[in-house]
């Protein structure tokens, strides 16, 4: 749908949490919204293609190095199916599944050879044979399952975005510490071997000083009614939690510290969630990040990380297994490959198991996730995007929570 100037609301200056932070928002007033639910995710089709490429190959023996844990999954959606596929391919089928609808859980278990279907979530948590839980439900439900699973002494791998806001993540981290278990964010970027290799090389000083990250992510999702999760505030819709987490995560991996200063513009949909945004970040070391996100405008998924001696370009970066380094002195292009897109979810399982075994580098991944969550939370609040679960915070800020 095209938006003309007279359908745009005014711009507002939003008070910032620090003097250097400025934010503006405009509220987009659509005449109507289509009743068509969003088309299937491009990412899902890409993942299917990646899985097809690996399904006839022997599973790599070097992915899983730590002692094996017994896993159960909460939820039976697209990402849960992808995880079940790759684990079955690895010869490590999931040990259990729980879902709000028991019939879906039974069908899921039959499809992937899952050992046990739980009649309730409490039954799963009480099963001493389950070591770790993978949470795949909508963003706004994560904190409930995190509280329950962590308190039950289960290690947890939780899909992105791991929580609604930084306060919830702080609570979950405290629970994990209290109960002596590992909590891990399942944002794929944190686990892909490609980025681990590039960060390793960066840390040797080979690339020189990191100066700037430029990251785009734009999808085209049809406007729909509130059953469309992308625009539904009651399902924590909006671009930031759905795709912004990828953009911020890849930049954070290469930056010395999290951003302190933010300057941003955002448009909200009529449902009140963030639809399109552009923002610039700067950390204490002076490293800049320039980002653009959209749920209603297609953009290439492209990340460019610039250093003194080179820049790195990664396309389709959420599960990338290759990138290009362009060297400043002679323009030489170096192709770097590591890992395989189709094994993205296996790397997540492997990283949690390694963290449980005491791998300090894997344990540190949650620190990156916490930095990203803090930035996402600050930006959303500066744009006036609060979810129903954040109604009290919205009232204190003098705005109404989306979907309230």
Predicted regions and their residues:
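Hydrophobic residues in well-ordered beta-strands that form the structural core
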Residues: 158, 183-185, 314
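C-terminal helix-rich "cap/oligomerization" subdomain common to oxidoreductases
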Residues: 34-65, 132-134, 351-404
């Amino acid at each position: 749908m095209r938006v003309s100037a007279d359908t745009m609301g005014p711009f507002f200056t939003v008070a910032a949490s620090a003097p250097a932070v400025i934010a503006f928002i405009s509220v987009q007033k659509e005449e109507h919204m289509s009743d068509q639910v969003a088309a299937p995710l491009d990412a899902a089709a890409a993942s299917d293609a990646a899985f097809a490429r690996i399904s006839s190959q022997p599973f790599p023996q070097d992915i899983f190095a730590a002692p094996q844990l017994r896993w159960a999954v909460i939820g039976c959606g697209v990402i849960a199916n992808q995880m079940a596929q790759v684990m079955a391919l690895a010869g490590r089928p999931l040990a259990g599944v729980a879902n709000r609808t028991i019939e879906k859980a039974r069908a899921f278990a039959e499809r992937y050879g899952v050992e046990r279907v739980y009649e309730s979530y409490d039954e799963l948590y009480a099963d001493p044979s389950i070591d770790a839980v993978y949470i795949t439900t909508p963003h706004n439900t994560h904190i409930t399952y995190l509280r329950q699973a962590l308190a039950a002494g289960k290690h947890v791998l939780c899909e992105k975005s791991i929580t609604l806001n930084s306060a919830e993540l702080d609570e979950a981290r405290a629970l994990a510490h209290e109960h002596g278990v590992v909590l891990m964010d399942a944002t794929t970027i944190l686990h892909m071997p490609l980025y681990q290799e590039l960060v390793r090389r960066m840390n040797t000083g080979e690339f020189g000083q990191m100066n700037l990250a430029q990251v785009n992510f734009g999808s085209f999702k049809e406007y729909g009614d509130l059953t469309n999760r992308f625009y539904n505030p009651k399902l924590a819709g909006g671009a930031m939690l759905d795709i912004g987490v990828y953009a911020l995560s890849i930049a954070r991996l290469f930056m010395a510290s999290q951003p302190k200063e933010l300057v941003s513009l955002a448009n909200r949909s009529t449902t009140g969630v963030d639809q399109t945004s552009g923002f610039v970040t700067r950390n204490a070391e002076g490293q800049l990040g320039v980002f653009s996100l959209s749920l209603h405008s297609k953009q290439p998924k492209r990340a460019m990380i610039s250093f003194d001696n080179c820049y790195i370009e990664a396309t389709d970066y959420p599960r990338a297994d290759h990138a290009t380094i362009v060297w400043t002195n002679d323009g030489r292009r170096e192709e770097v490959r590591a890992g395989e897109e189709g094994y993205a979810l296996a790397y997540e399982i492997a990283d949690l198991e390694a963290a449980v075994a005491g791998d300090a580098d894997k344990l540190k991944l949650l620190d990156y996730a916490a930095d990203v969550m803090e930035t996402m939370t600050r930006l959303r609040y500066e744009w006036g995007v609060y979810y129903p679960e954040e109604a009290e915070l919205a009232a204190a800020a003098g705005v109404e929570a989306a979907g309230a």
